[in-house]
């Protein structure tokens, strides 16, 4: 989407609901390029790891901290994303890229994600200001109810941080407060076409069910932070490094390949939020 800029209505919707959906945020050509890399890149597969849900089903993901000049790095550094994030976050210090993860829910075996807030994880990293943190999900393939699309509880970002504990290998929100939220606020299934984007607050309660369909669900989730919001228990310094913004056209016009080995991939046993 060339020269994209959020409207005042979208910014207000984010403040009220804790999320916004932007349809056709990426072109079909951009999605085709990203999908080809996702399924064929050695670095992505080599650094992938599984997290078990409560039933033992596995969700596979690859997470990295440092966006480079590869296709995924150029997307996360693109003007359309970073400028949008800058307008949605509280504060005024520079926007930094915390990390990106490629979510890989394979047909029939891709596991669920339990109800949680992203800040439920990041609180353990000792970030202090959840209003200065945001996630941006881009659908690489279609996301629908059948293949375990994201579910959100609208407006729950205003509840503040909910207590979290372990649910399988994941960090899950207190079921009591989830039940209270579901009695009070609407549940929304976030069904996305390839190229659609979801911007959501770090305290928005969300989950996804297992993929029991015949089709894979792939998505990129990039997380951003204001430079002045220090993660005192976060060993990687990416969250304090301002994003070097590139033009939106870079994804298609610059010579790119798969995710670079210098991207700083996470090793599962070193994730502070899982301890």
Say what each PLM segment does.
Residues 143-205:
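Double-stranded beta-helix
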Residues 44, 48-50, 54, 84, ...:
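Non-heme Fe(II)/2-oxoglutarate
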Residues 2-17, 22-126, 165, 235, ...:
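Non-heme Fe(II)-dependent double-stranded beta-helix
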Residues 93-100, 111-113, 132-138, 148, ...:
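Generic beta-strand structural signal
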Residues 81, 107-110, 143-145, 158, ...:
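Short, charged/polar surface micro-motifs in flexible loops or helix N-caps
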Residues 104-107, 153-160, 217, 223-229:
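Short edge-strand/loop segments of extracellular domains
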Residues 59, 117-120, 170-184, 216, ...:
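Short, surface-exposed loop/helix-turn segments at secondary-structure junctions
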Residues 123-145, 191-192, 223-226:
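Short, conserved beta-strand element in jelly-roll/cupin
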